[in-house]
Swiss-Prot record:
One of its GO terms (biological process) is positive regulation of transcription by RNA polymerase II. TAF3 heterodimerizes with TAF10. The 1.2 MDa TFIID complex is composed of TATA binding protein (TBP) and the 14 TBP-associated factors. One copy of each TAF1, TAF2, TAF3, TAF7, TAF8, TAF11, TAF13, two copies of each TAF4, TAF5, TAF6, TAF9, TAF10, TAF12, and three copies of TAF14. It comes from Saccharomyces cerevisiae (strain ATCC 204508 / S288c). Its main location: nucleus. It comes from the Eukaryota. The modification Phosphoserine is found at residues 310, 346. Present with 3300 molecules/cell in log phase SD medium. Functions as a component of the DNA-binding general transcription factor complex TFIID. Binding of TFIID to a promoter (with or without TATA element) is the initial step in pre-initiation complex (PIC) formation. TFIID plays a key role in the regulation of gene expression by RNA polymerase II through different activities such as transcription activator interaction, core promoter recognition and selectivity, TFIIA and TFIIB interaction, chromatin modification (histone acetylation by TAF1), facilitation of DNA opening and initiation of transcription. Pfam families: Bromo_TP. Keywords: Coiled coil, Nucleus, Phosphoprotein, Transcription, Transcription regulation. This is Transcription initiation factor TFIID subunit 3.
Length: 353
Protein backbone atom coordinates (compact mmCIF):
# COMPACT_ATOMS: atom_id res chain seq x y z
CA UNK A 1 0.00 0.00 0.00
CA UNK A 2 1.34 3.44 -0.96
CA UNK A 3 1.98 5.79 1.94
CA UNK A 4 1.55 9.56 1.93
CA UNK A 5 5.32 10.12 1.70
CA UNK A 6 5.56 7.99 -1.44
CA UNK A 7 2.62 9.82 -3.00
CA UNK A 8 4.07 13.28 -2.37
CA UNK A 9 7.50 12.12 -3.50
CA UNK A 10 5.99 11.00 -6.82
CA UNK A 11 4.30 14.40 -7.27
CA UNK A 12 7.56 16.22 -6.55
CA UNK A 13 9.36 13.95 -8.98
CA UNK A 14 7.14 15.28 -11.79
CA UNK A 15 8.13 18.86 -10.91
CA UNK A 16 11.81 17.91 -10.94
CA UNK A 17 11.41 16.38 -14.40
CA UNK A 18 9.83 19.58 -15.66
CA UNK A 19 12.62 21.69 -14.13
CA UNK A 20 15.31 19.52 -15.70
CA UNK A 21 13.60 19.72 -19.07
CA UNK A 22 13.38 23.52 -18.79
CA UNK A 23 17.14 23.62 -18.16
CA UNK A 24 17.82 21.66 -21.36
CA UNK A 25 18.01 18.06 -20.12
CA UNK A 26 16.03 15.85 -22.50
CA UNK A 27 16.58 12.55 -20.69
CA UNK A 28 17.99 11.26 -17.44
CA UNK A 29 18.25 8.02 -15.53
CA UNK A 30 15.51 7.21 -13.01
CA UNK A 31 18.08 6.95 -10.23
CA UNK A 32 19.37 10.46 -11.01
CA UNK A 33 15.84 11.86 -10.97
CA UNK A 34 15.23 10.22 -7.59
CA UNK A 35 18.43 11.76 -6.18
CA UNK A 36 17.50 15.23 -7.46
CA UNK A 37 14.02 14.87 -5.99
CA UNK A 38 15.42 13.80 -2.62
CA UNK A 39 17.85 16.75 -2.54
CA UNK A 40 15.07 19.16 -3.46
CA UNK A 41 12.86 17.83 -0.65
CA UNK A 42 15.70 18.00 1.91
CA UNK A 43 16.63 21.55 0.95
CA UNK A 44 13.01 22.71 0.99
CA UNK A 45 12.46 21.26 4.47
CA UNK A 46 15.68 22.93 5.65
CA UNK A 47 14.50 26.30 4.31
CA UNK A 48 11.10 25.92 5.99
CA UNK A 49 12.66 25.05 9.35
CA UNK A 50 15.06 28.05 9.09
CA UNK A 51 12.20 30.45 8.37
CA UNK A 52 10.21 29.04 11.30
CA UNK A 53 13.14 29.39 13.73
CA UNK A 54 13.82 33.00 12.66
CA UNK A 55 10.15 33.90 13.07
CA UNK A 56 10.13 32.45 16.60
CA UNK A 57 13.33 34.32 17.49
CA UNK A 58 11.80 37.63 16.44
CA UNK A 59 9.29 37.29 19.34
CA UNK A 60 6.38 38.85 17.52
CA UNK A 61 2.99 39.00 19.16
CA UNK A 62 0.99 37.30 16.41
CA UNK A 63 3.72 34.71 15.56
CA UNK A 64 3.30 35.28 11.82
CA UNK A 65 6.05 34.93 9.24
CA UNK A 66 7.16 38.26 7.81
CA UNK A 67 9.08 39.06 4.63
CA UNK A 68 12.29 39.75 6.51
CA UNK A 69 12.15 36.25 8.00
CA UNK A 70 12.19 34.70 4.53
CA UNK A 71 14.93 37.08 3.37
CA UNK A 72 17.15 36.31 6.34
CA UNK A 73 16.58 32.56 5.88
CA UNK A 74 17.63 32.80 2.22
CA UNK A 75 20.77 34.70 3.25
CA UNK A 76 21.61 32.18 5.97
CA UNK A 77 21.33 29.27 3.54
CA UNK A 78 23.41 31.06 0.90
CA UNK A 79 20.72 31.37 -1.70
CA UNK A 80 20.93 35.17 -1.66
CA UNK A 81 24.25 36.85 -0.91
CA UNK A 82 24.00 40.21 0.88
CA UNK A 83 25.85 43.24 -0.54
CA UNK A 84 27.28 44.34 2.81
CA UNK A 85 26.86 42.34 5.94
CA UNK A 86 28.48 44.77 8.35
CA UNK A 87 29.55 48.37 7.64
CA UNK A 88 30.88 49.62 10.94
CA UNK A 89 32.14 52.90 9.68
CA UNK A 90 29.29 53.49 7.22
CA UNK A 91 31.66 53.85 4.29
CA UNK A 92 29.09 52.80 1.69
CA UNK A 93 25.98 54.41 3.01
CA UNK A 94 24.52 55.00 -0.44
CA UNK A 95 24.78 51.32 -1.34
CA UNK A 96 21.49 49.48 -0.84
CA UNK A 97 21.65 46.45 1.42
CA UNK A 98 18.70 44.78 -0.37
CA UNK A 99 20.43 44.65 -3.74
CA UNK A 100 20.67 40.86 -3.62
CA UNK A 101 16.96 40.45 -3.01
CA UNK A 102 16.19 42.82 -5.85
CA UNK A 103 18.27 40.72 -8.23
CA UNK A 104 16.54 37.59 -6.97
CA UNK A 105 13.19 39.24 -7.63
CA UNK A 106 14.20 40.25 -11.16
CA UNK A 107 15.36 36.71 -11.84
CA UNK A 108 12.05 35.27 -10.72
CA UNK A 109 10.05 37.67 -12.88
CA UNK A 110 12.12 38.16 -16.03
CA UNK A 111 14.15 34.99 -16.28
CA UNK A 112 13.70 33.02 -19.52
CA UNK A 113 14.42 29.78 -17.70
CA UNK A 114 11.37 30.16 -15.49
CA UNK A 115 9.28 31.07 -18.52
CA UNK A 116 10.44 27.93 -20.29
CA UNK A 117 9.73 25.93 -17.14
CA UNK A 118 6.15 27.19 -17.08
CA UNK A 119 5.69 26.31 -20.73
CA UNK A 120 7.17 22.88 -20.15
CA UNK A 121 4.90 22.27 -17.19
CA UNK A 122 1.79 22.66 -19.35
CA UNK A 123 0.40 19.56 -21.09
CA UNK A 124 0.71 19.28 -24.85
CA UNK A 125 -1.22 17.54 -27.59
CA UNK A 126 1.76 15.29 -28.36
CA UNK A 127 1.14 13.45 -25.10
CA UNK A 128 -2.23 12.31 -26.45
CA UNK A 129 -1.01 11.53 -29.95
CA UNK A 130 2.00 9.47 -28.91
CA UNK A 131 1.67 5.91 -30.14
CA UNK A 132 4.01 3.00 -29.54
CA UNK A 133 5.41 1.41 -32.66
CA UNK A 134 4.54 -2.25 -32.90
CA UNK A 135 6.75 -4.73 -34.72
CA UNK A 136 5.11 -5.94 -37.90
CA UNK A 137 6.41 -9.36 -38.99
CA UNK A 138 4.80 -8.87 -42.42
CA UNK A 139 6.70 -5.67 -43.21
CA UNK A 140 9.36 -7.60 -45.16
CA UNK A 141 6.74 -9.25 -47.37
CA UNK A 142 5.81 -7.38 -50.55
CA UNK A 143 2.49 -5.60 -50.63
CA UNK A 144 1.09 -7.70 -53.45
CA UNK A 145 1.49 -10.83 -51.31
CA UNK A 146 0.00 -9.67 -48.04
CA UNK A 147 -2.57 -7.22 -49.34
CA UNK A 148 -5.41 -9.12 -47.72
CA UNK A 149 -3.62 -9.21 -44.38
CA UNK A 150 -2.90 -5.49 -44.49
CA UNK A 151 -6.50 -4.60 -45.34
CA UNK A 152 -7.79 -6.72 -42.46
CA UNK A 153 -9.18 -4.43 -39.78
CA UNK A 154 -8.38 -1.24 -41.74
CA UNK A 155 -11.94 0.03 -41.37
CA UNK A 156 -11.91 -0.49 -37.62
CA UNK A 157 -8.56 1.28 -37.26
CA UNK A 158 -9.89 4.23 -39.26
CA UNK A 159 -12.93 4.53 -36.99
CA UNK A 160 -10.71 4.43 -33.89
CA UNK A 161 -8.46 7.13 -35.31
CA UNK A 162 -11.43 9.37 -36.11
CA UNK A 163 -12.79 9.02 -32.57
CA UNK A 164 -9.40 9.91 -31.10
CA UNK A 165 -9.13 12.96 -33.37
CA UNK A 166 -12.59 14.18 -32.35
CA UNK A 167 -11.72 13.79 -28.67
CA UNK A 168 -8.46 15.75 -29.03
CA UNK A 169 -10.14 18.54 -31.00
CA UNK A 170 -12.85 18.81 -28.37
CA UNK A 171 -10.17 19.12 -25.67
CA UNK A 172 -8.34 21.87 -27.59
CA UNK A 173 -11.51 23.87 -28.30
CA UNK A 174 -12.51 23.79 -24.62
CA UNK A 175 -9.04 24.97 -23.47
CA UNK A 176 -8.43 21.69 -21.70
CA UNK A 177 -4.68 21.73 -22.37
CA UNK A 178 -4.14 24.11 -19.44
CA UNK A 179 -5.23 21.47 -16.94
CA UNK A 180 -3.38 18.23 -16.29
CA UNK A 181 -6.45 16.57 -14.81
CA UNK A 182 -8.47 17.06 -18.01
CA UNK A 183 -5.56 15.74 -20.02
CA UNK A 184 -5.27 12.62 -17.88
CA UNK A 185 -9.02 11.97 -18.24
CA UNK A 186 -8.76 12.38 -22.00
CA UNK A 187 -5.80 9.98 -22.06
CA UNK A 188 -7.83 7.38 -20.19
CA UNK A 189 -10.72 7.72 -22.63
CA UNK A 190 -8.34 7.26 -25.56
CA UNK A 191 -6.89 4.13 -23.93
CA UNK A 192 -10.40 2.71 -23.53
CA UNK A 193 -11.12 3.38 -27.21
CA UNK A 194 -7.90 1.63 -28.26
CA UNK A 195 -8.58 -1.31 -25.95
CA UNK A 196 -12.08 -1.73 -27.35
CA UNK A 197 -10.82 -1.62 -30.94
CA UNK A 198 -8.34 -4.47 -30.31
CA UNK A 199 -11.05 -6.86 -29.14
CA UNK A 200 -12.38 -9.31 -31.70
CA UNK A 201 -16.00 -8.98 -32.70
CA UNK A 202 -18.22 -11.62 -31.10
CA UNK A 203 -20.55 -12.17 -34.06
CA UNK A 204 -22.41 -15.48 -33.81
CA UNK A 205 -22.87 -16.11 -37.57
CA UNK A 206 -19.16 -15.42 -38.15
CA UNK A 207 -18.06 -18.12 -35.71
CA UNK A 208 -16.68 -21.40 -37.11
CA UNK A 209 -18.77 -24.55 -37.34
CA UNK A 210 -19.47 -26.19 -33.99
CA UNK A 211 -20.88 -29.66 -33.46
CA UNK A 212 -24.45 -29.44 -32.23
CA UNK A 213 -24.75 -25.76 -33.15
CA UNK A 214 -27.77 -26.37 -35.39
CA UNK A 215 -30.01 -27.52 -32.54
CA UNK A 216 -28.55 -25.04 -30.07
CA UNK A 217 -30.27 -21.94 -28.76
CA UNK A 218 -27.49 -19.90 -30.38
CA UNK A 219 -28.52 -20.95 -33.89
CA UNK A 220 -29.62 -18.39 -36.40
CA UNK A 221 -33.37 -19.09 -36.35
CA UNK A 222 -33.43 -18.91 -32.56
CA UNK A 223 -31.21 -15.85 -32.62
CA UNK A 224 -33.61 -13.91 -34.84
CA UNK A 225 -36.81 -14.77 -32.96
CA UNK A 226 -35.59 -13.99 -29.43
CA UNK A 227 -35.53 -10.36 -28.37
CA UNK A 228 -33.09 -8.76 -25.98
CA UNK A 229 -35.72 -8.63 -23.26
CA UNK A 230 -36.16 -12.41 -23.41
CA UNK A 231 -32.45 -12.93 -22.82
CA UNK A 232 -32.45 -10.88 -19.62
CA UNK A 233 -32.81 -13.03 -16.48
CA UNK A 234 -36.05 -12.50 -14.62
CA UNK A 235 -36.26 -12.60 -10.83
CA UNK A 236 -38.22 -15.64 -9.65
CA UNK A 237 -40.77 -15.26 -6.92
CA UNK A 238 -40.08 -17.02 -3.63
CA UNK A 239 -43.22 -19.15 -3.91
CA UNK A 240 -43.17 -22.34 -5.92
CA UNK A 241 -46.70 -21.82 -7.19
CA UNK A 242 -45.83 -18.51 -8.78
CA UNK A 243 -42.72 -20.02 -10.33
CA UNK A 244 -44.75 -22.91 -11.75
CA UNK A 245 -47.30 -20.48 -13.17
CA UNK A 246 -44.56 -18.47 -14.81
CA UNK A 247 -43.06 -21.58 -16.39
CA UNK A 248 -46.46 -22.66 -17.71
CA UNK A 249 -47.09 -19.25 -19.21
CA UNK A 250 -43.73 -19.33 -20.95
CA UNK A 251 -43.49 -22.73 -22.70
CA UNK A 252 -40.50 -21.57 -24.70
CA UNK A 253 -38.23 -22.26 -21.72
CA UNK A 254 -39.40 -25.84 -21.23
CA UNK A 255 -39.25 -26.54 -24.95
CA UNK A 256 -35.48 -26.05 -24.81
CA UNK A 257 -34.99 -28.90 -22.34
CA UNK A 258 -33.29 -31.99 -23.81
CA UNK A 259 -36.08 -34.27 -22.56
CA UNK A 260 -38.62 -32.43 -24.72
CA UNK A 261 -36.92 -33.53 -27.94
CA UNK A 262 -38.13 -36.67 -29.68
CA UNK A 263 -34.68 -38.09 -30.29
CA UNK A 264 -33.94 -37.98 -26.55
CA UNK A 265 -36.99 -39.97 -25.44
CA UNK A 266 -36.55 -43.41 -23.89
CA UNK A 267 -38.33 -45.35 -26.61
CA UNK A 268 -36.13 -43.76 -29.28
CA UNK A 269 -32.81 -44.48 -27.55
CA UNK A 270 -30.88 -47.56 -28.74
CA UNK A 271 -27.82 -49.05 -27.14
CA UNK A 272 -24.58 -49.60 -29.00
CA UNK A 273 -24.52 -53.39 -28.45
CA UNK A 274 -28.02 -54.00 -29.81
CA UNK A 275 -28.19 -55.64 -33.24
CA UNK A 276 -31.01 -54.37 -35.38
CA UNK A 277 -30.68 -57.30 -37.80
CA UNK A 278 -31.36 -59.84 -35.07
CA UNK A 279 -34.42 -57.92 -34.02
CA UNK A 280 -35.73 -57.93 -37.58
CA UNK A 281 -35.13 -61.68 -37.89
CA UNK A 282 -36.91 -62.27 -34.59
CA UNK A 283 -39.92 -60.41 -35.86
CA UNK A 284 -40.07 -62.61 -38.98
CA UNK A 285 -39.66 -65.90 -37.10
CA UNK A 286 -42.10 -64.97 -34.37
CA UNK A 287 -45.30 -66.60 -35.81
CA UNK A 288 -43.52 -69.88 -36.72
CA UNK A 289 -42.07 -70.16 -33.25
CA UNK A 290 -45.48 -69.67 -31.64
CA UNK A 291 -47.04 -72.39 -33.80
CA UNK A 292 -44.23 -74.81 -32.86
CA UNK A 293 -44.77 -74.13 -29.16
CA UNK A 294 -48.49 -74.86 -29.54
CA UNK A 295 -47.70 -78.21 -31.24
CA UNK A 296 -45.35 -79.18 -28.41
CA UNK A 297 -48.01 -78.49 -25.82
CA UNK A 298 -50.56 -80.61 -27.67
CA UNK A 299 -48.14 -83.55 -27.98
CA UNK A 300 -47.32 -83.35 -24.28
CA UNK A 301 -51.01 -83.52 -23.38
CA UNK A 302 -51.50 -86.56 -25.63
CA UNK A 303 -48.61 -88.41 -23.99
CA UNK A 304 -50.03 -87.82 -20.54
CA UNK A 305 -53.40 -89.05 -21.68
CA UNK A 306 -51.91 -92.27 -23.09
CA UNK A 307 -50.19 -93.03 -19.82
CA UNK A 308 -53.37 -92.73 -17.79
CA UNK A 309 -55.40 -94.98 -20.14
CA UNK A 310 -55.59 -98.78 -19.52
CA UNK A 311 -53.66 -101.07 -21.85
CA UNK A 312 -56.64 -103.51 -21.98
CA UNK A 313 -59.11 -100.85 -22.89
CA UNK A 314 -61.04 -101.37 -19.65
CA UNK A 315 -62.17 -98.44 -17.59
CA UNK A 316 -61.97 -100.43 -14.38
CA UNK A 317 -58.25 -100.90 -14.71
CA UNK A 318 -57.83 -97.17 -14.28
CA UNK A 319 -58.72 -97.45 -10.61
CA UNK A 320 -56.52 -100.42 -9.89
CA UNK A 321 -54.13 -98.31 -7.92
CA UNK A 322 -56.84 -96.60 -5.96
CA UNK A 323 -57.73 -97.82 -2.41
CA UNK A 324 -61.21 -98.68 -1.36
CA UNK A 325 -62.82 -96.67 1.37
CA UNK A 326 -63.29 -99.85 3.51
CA UNK A 327 -59.66 -100.93 3.27
CA UNK A 328 -57.58 -100.21 6.32
CA UNK A 329 -54.33 -98.63 5.25
CA UNK A 330 -52.66 -99.23 8.60
CA UNK A 331 -50.23 -102.11 9.00
CA UNK A 332 -50.83 -104.83 11.49
CA UNK A 333 -47.53 -104.13 13.17
CA UNK A 334 -48.74 -100.68 14.09
CA UNK A 335 -51.47 -102.20 16.26
CA UNK A 336 -49.08 -104.36 18.26
CA UNK A 337 -45.82 -102.61 19.13
CA UNK A 338 -44.21 -105.83 20.44
CA UNK A 339 -44.73 -107.73 17.21
CA UNK A 340 -43.36 -104.75 15.36
CA UNK A 341 -40.11 -104.77 17.34
CA UNK A 342 -39.81 -108.56 16.88
CA UNK A 343 -40.25 -108.21 13.15
CA UNK A 344 -37.57 -105.57 12.99
CA UNK A 345 -35.20 -107.73 15.04
CA UNK A 346 -35.76 -110.67 12.74
CA UNK A 347 -35.03 -108.51 9.77
CA UNK A 348 -31.84 -107.14 11.26
CA UNK A 349 -30.38 -110.47 12.43
CA UNK A 350 -31.43 -112.69 9.57
CA UNK A 351 -34.55 -114.21 11.23
CA UNK A 352 -37.40 -115.87 9.41
CA UNK A 353 -39.89 -113.73 7.53
Amino acid sequence: MTTNNDFYFALLRISILQLLKAQGFDRARPSLVDVMTDLYAKFLSLLASEVSSIAQARCDQDDTIALQDITLALENLGIVKPTNVLDVYDENSELSSSRGMEKFKDWCIYSTQLTDARITALPTVELLQSEEKESDPLSAIPDYLNQLLQNKGAKQKLETKNRKTELIEDLINNNGLDDWIKLVIARQRINMIERASKKESQNVPALPHIAGYKSSILSRHHHTTITNEDRMPSAMTPRDEDALTEIQENPFVTSKLPIMRKENRLENITLSFEDEELESLGEVEGPNQKSQENNNEESFKENNKSLTESPHGDDRDISMFQFDSNVDTKWAEQEDMDSTFQRRTSLDYGGYF
